[in-house]
């Protein structure tokens, strides 16, 4: 059963004031995972620009990639804002979909609890030395929390530990858990460190200043693709102009997120905050060094291939899904041209 929460991205007041063209807007079903890299979606849905452009967006939140892909493949979602790897895998299994825009690279960071943070501080932030020192001092491995296998933050963690930091595997223990569970475990000191997605990493450090940000995504796996916009083959065949319009709006919204986080924050808070996060915290998370905002698919192509290749090494799949035809560069460029850029 798909675990999702659906809401319409327009208020009743907005509907009553909408122009005639907007009232006959095309219904577009958009799925998303609740991460900061999807923020442009929340802006274009929340500020009314989508409806003004003739798109009536219905947003569906998915708490995991597999559930989102299941809905996407079943035909109940037209567009999906999610990590690139699940899209590539779905395509390799016969589902017709392409990436029509990038959204962000990175988006996560590794944070350490008090004891592990001290080990890093005492050892010049050298991962191998820090984890070895922690084990010597505590008499046990450092327990690290991260998302399930295959998730981008999890891939980034493994790459940082084994490829960048050359950490001894005997010094760490990795526990896979959900997005919100990692945050809760850090605050409860149930784990010694973990990979946290924004805005969780900003929130956790604000709530417990003893927790320290050790390394951001760029230092874990350079240019690692965070989030993309994928369209179903059926939607592209029947509504290609709408897909192009969406990409143009998404690009405009991305500029707002990158250049004016305070302006974007209320819309992102409405989608991600759940009433428990301050708007200022969201604004700081949007400006986090853990994330970069990018829309042009060609800018993430090489990093996507590197990501998928490393996932084979991790055992996430036997062979890397092909990226041939994965990115619809032509549609993206038409959208940019139509938007007058």
What do these predicted regions represent?
Residues 6-22:
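N-terminal export signals
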Residues 24-35, 55-60, 142-145, 174-175:
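Short, well-ordered beta-strand elements
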Residues 27-46, 65:
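Extracytoplasmic "Venus flytrap"
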Residues 40-44, 60-98, 108-112, 132-133, ...:
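Pocket-flanking alpha-helical
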Residues 43-45, 109-120, 225-241:
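A bilobed periplasmic-binding-protein/Venus flytrap-type ligand-binding module shared by bacterial periplasmic
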Residues 103-175, 180, 233:
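A conserved helix-loop-strand patch within extracytoplasmic ligand-binding domains
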Residues 181-271:
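Pocket-lining segment of extracytoplasmic ligand-binding domains
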Residues 237-318:
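Secondary-structure end/capping motifs
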